[in-house]
């Protein structure tokens, strides 16, 4: 055979294998890792076992394992035998470095659908602060550094999981911050790993014995020992064994530093030296909002953990009831709003982001109302509305079917902001007491169907809400766009007026929306259900001559329309 032709054949086979590679075929069912961290050297070394299951419909002989591009593969074995692999850089914004180190592996035999294999792996390298993916996307360097602050170092090591730093093996398709692919890739990964678990023995090496490991898992044990000593220094080591699960929507995250713990019944604050007063402010804020939070969501099932980050400008990060944040205590109200969010996470956990995250944000709006009234709560929610409108507009421009409904959405804007509004609308529709009953009857272990929570709400409210769930949960119909179509006042024999108000929803999503009729003596309010692309008429009696009708007070997320307010001419001028 002609050598050139032979080479072309080989290349074709290799390219065919590359194109056929399914990076999403395997689910990482369980990790059992020992992770050693050297803060002084910014170093990480890990070894352990990974259990993978073929969740595709076809047998799989090839797979990929990916770690941060600042780490390298040392070994990959199956049944005690080394597997040949090729490790190459893989450009993607899944990791803070803007790339992964991907090992392409060919297995000795195909793994059938639902088949399980267990690999022994070893890898290591360094984790330094790196915001390449953000600066590459045009984010200013200073802003990028405050967002992607993850690093192993002194005085604080803080490392988040997939989506920030791939410090444990993953397998995802390439994704970019320049479009929606990063959010979609992470959402698919989180959904596929929603039942996966991890056990990680996280160890540090250093010259002080005061280092602590804090992680967003369940602590199973702590072990410390002296590794060696010289006239100049003593080398210490400590290990903390954590179990994480499920890890799909809660990426394993850890911090290592000389932390001091300020412990209260509902919260533990881990602070650095000299920060006890600020730590107490966090504890006091949590204790102040706890009774109100418990009335709504029930008593916390776990403790809130606040872990101090050293740099004042770093962006806070939450993972369930754990919050990594620089201490910010000058605004007491903001602190209380932040703490009720963490307490809500501690009270209600759910495998569904629209419940877990949506309720936490809803709790913040409730606290804003508790502090300064309904208008303040609506203003709080409206600061996030432009992002939601932009996300819905972007989804509408995409050809093909609309994105999944809120019950299964992996878009952060949807399961945080839109879900917050959904909970607020449900509260306005069914009342506090009914919604509280539904929330307190929720059991995550029984949530095996997307209709589970909606059924609890409908049962507690005693009314048919299927139309609302269909528009806002099961399907993504976008946002309403309300306008006052007409308003006709009619004088009554008692000297009052009845105003026939017709509201039109130009959007596809319906809602129960408040309408307001303004008179010289004040304002009358009534609620009306307006279905998408339809009109609804409501008659409102007011004590004096009406001057204006307004639809929506901002409690329903809607596209703004200049026709949302309509002036009513005085009766004498009609």
Regions inferred by a protein language model and the residue ranges of each:
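N-terminal, polar/Ser/Thr-rich
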Residues: 18-45, 74, 466-467, 472
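Zn2+-dependent metallopeptidase catalytic core
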Residues: 48, 193, 200-211, 236-244, ...
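A surface-exposed beta-strand-loop module
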Residues: 71-148, 185-190, 229-232, 534-545, ...
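Beta-strand-rich binding/interaction modules
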Residues: 75-77, 211-214, 465, 481, ...
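Extended, low-hydrophobicity, Ser/Thr/Pro/Gly-biased non-transmembrane segments
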Residues: 103, 119-249
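Juxtacatalytic substrate-recognition/specificity segment
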Residues: 255-355, 359, 363, 558
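Amphipathic alpha-helical substructures
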Residues: 301, 412-495
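Acidic/His/Gly-enriched intrinsically disordered linker/tail segments
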Residues: 353-430
